[in-house]
């Protein structure tokens, strides 16, 4: 490995014996021998890896050459079948594109929505226009008025004054667009006139005994 002859090795041993002495020389020889072994093992592993990589590269090259040769030497039957498959695939593509071209003119695309209110409600301008035409126009004003009835209760056969009950109802006015308007019912006021029984007071005064006080000396 290092191209060292016997004379050179003997010279190295003599120098080591003089420098290290007889006690350290065997230890030095062992360490040097261990280093030589490790270096030889590393060199062997590197050579083996390089050889394997070269073999793998050669195999790959040979496989590529074999595939190219096999494709060139195909039988005419295989070539015909491959051509038929290609033609069928192209026919399917042409039919698909023709169907798409026929369906394209019949499709109706919605126009772009530019109004923010229509975008928020999710209604296109065309739909809003049709809804506006279809909806009938409401009358300008619809006023529903209710009559305020007055109830008059007459008293019985006795001489009582009539009791009058007045109930008022509010009028409901509907808006122009027929939107629901909240109707506030005003509280019902009942006016009752106090009854004065004059007849009973007169009769009560008549029933009381009249006391005659004697006057003074006449």
From Swiss-Prot:
Q: Which GO terms describe its cellular component?
A: TAT protein transport complex
Q: Which InterPro entries match?
A: TatA/B/E, TatB
Ranges annotated as biased composition (Basic and acidic residues): 199-218
Record-level Gene Ontology MF annotations = protein transmembrane transporter activity
Domain of life of the organism encoding this protein:
Bacteria
Look up keyword Phosphoprotein and say if it applies: no
Instruction: Extract the ranges annotated as region (Disordered).
Output: 126-145, 174-218
Write down the membrane topology.
Answer: Single-pass membrane protein
Q: Which Gene3D superfamilies match?
A: 1.20.5.3310
| UniProt keyword annotations, A-Z | Cell inner membrane, Cell membrane, Membrane, Protein transport, Translocation, Transmembrane, Transmembrane helix, Transport
What transmembrane ranges does the database entry give? 1-21
The protein's location, in the record's own words, is: Cell inner membrane
Keyword Cell cycle in record: no
Which family is this protein grouped under?
Answer: Belongs to the TatB family.
Report quaternary structure and partners: The Tat system comprises two distinct complexes: a TatABC complex, containing multiple copies of TatA, TatB and TatC subunits, and a separate TatA complex, containing only TatA subunits. Substrates initially bind to the TatABC complex, which probably triggers association of the separate TatA complex to form the active translocon.
Q: Under what name is this protein listed? A: Sec-independent protein translocase protein TatB
Q: What is the lineage of its organism?
A: Bacteria, Pseudomonadati, Pseudomonadota, Gammaproteobacteria, Enterobacterales
What is the primary gene name for this protein?
A: tatB
